[in-house]
């Protein structure tokens, strides 16, 4: 019979509790700041057609985010990263991660370019009801184009969060969502008063929040020895495995996102302010 030393068990339990406490604290702060963000936007802009335009515009890159960032990182990348690290060596896992980053940045950059070009068509897909109000429709298109690059930033963040969680670094990933809210809240008071259409300042704040999220991940990535320079991923066996794993999971997640598109579209036909609520 093998006995587990109580000291080691106690130390492991202590680490788990510490990590759980850190994650819980940052999650709570993120929720509080999220509520504060909504209050600030409501206070500055009210609950009308302008905030409806912002909400609909932000929904579009967020729907893609759930496919390219959260879904792919959680369902495909992270299990493969851990498997490669355990079967081969940490260096091989880091190389795989850098190649995955190349895929992520390549795909999201292409999607962002396409999304910015075809923003009017996407806005009509998500909010056909806005077409009856040219001013609202055009503002939504403009905000969509401004915020679309957030898809690139948040996908990088999801990639780094997956690596850091696998390496037992939980503080920076847990804290990252806080800074999106910080960027939006700060922009409402600093940038919005400086631009012709104040709501555009909130769109810029989304981008700033995404950049800050990346910056706070970098020190932890350096500590675990992860390069942020994308590597050539063509003809890589593990990247091919990653793409095969992604296929079925993306189809399943896309079904749920279609539901969001339908609901947003229906809401766009309702009176101003209903989308925001």
Residue ranges and their predicted role:
Residues 1-277:
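Membrane-embedded alpha-helical bundles of multi-pass transporters/translocases
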């Amino acid at each position: 019979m093998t006995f587990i030393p109580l000291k080691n068990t106690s130390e492991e339990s202590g680490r788990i509790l510490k990590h759980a406490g850190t994650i819980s604290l940052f999650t709570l702060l993120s929720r509080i700041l999220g509520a504060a963000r909504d209050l600030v936007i409501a206070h500055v802009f009210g609950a009308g057609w302008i905030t409806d335009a912002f909400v609909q515009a932000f929904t579009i890159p967020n729907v893609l985010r759930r496919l390219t960032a959260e879904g792919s990182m959680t369902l495909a990348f992270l299990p493969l990263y851990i498997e490669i690290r355990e079967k081969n060596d940490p260096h091989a896992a880091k190389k795989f991660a850098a190649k995955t980053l190349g895929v992520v940045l390549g795909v999201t950059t292409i999607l962002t370019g396409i999304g910015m070009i075809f923003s009017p068509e996407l806005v009509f897909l998500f909010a056909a009801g806005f077409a009856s109000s040219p001013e609202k429709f055009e503002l939504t298109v403009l905000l969509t184009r401004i915020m679309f690059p957030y898809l690139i930033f948040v996908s990088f963040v999801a990639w780094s969060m997956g690596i850091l969680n696998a390496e037992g670094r939980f503080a920076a990933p847990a804290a990252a969502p806080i800074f999106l809210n910080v960027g939006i809240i700060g922009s409402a008071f600093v940038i919005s008063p400086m631009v012709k259409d104040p709501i555009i300042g909130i769109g810029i704040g989304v981008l700033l929040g995404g950049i800050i999220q990346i910056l706070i991940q970098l020190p932890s990535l350096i500590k675990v020895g992860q390069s942020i320079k994308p590597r050539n991923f063509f003809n890589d066996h593990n990247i091919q495995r990653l793409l095969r794993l992604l296929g079925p999971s993306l189809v399943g997640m896309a079904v749920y996102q279609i539901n969001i598109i339908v609901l947003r579209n229906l809401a766009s036909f309702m009176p101003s302010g209903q989308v925001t609520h």
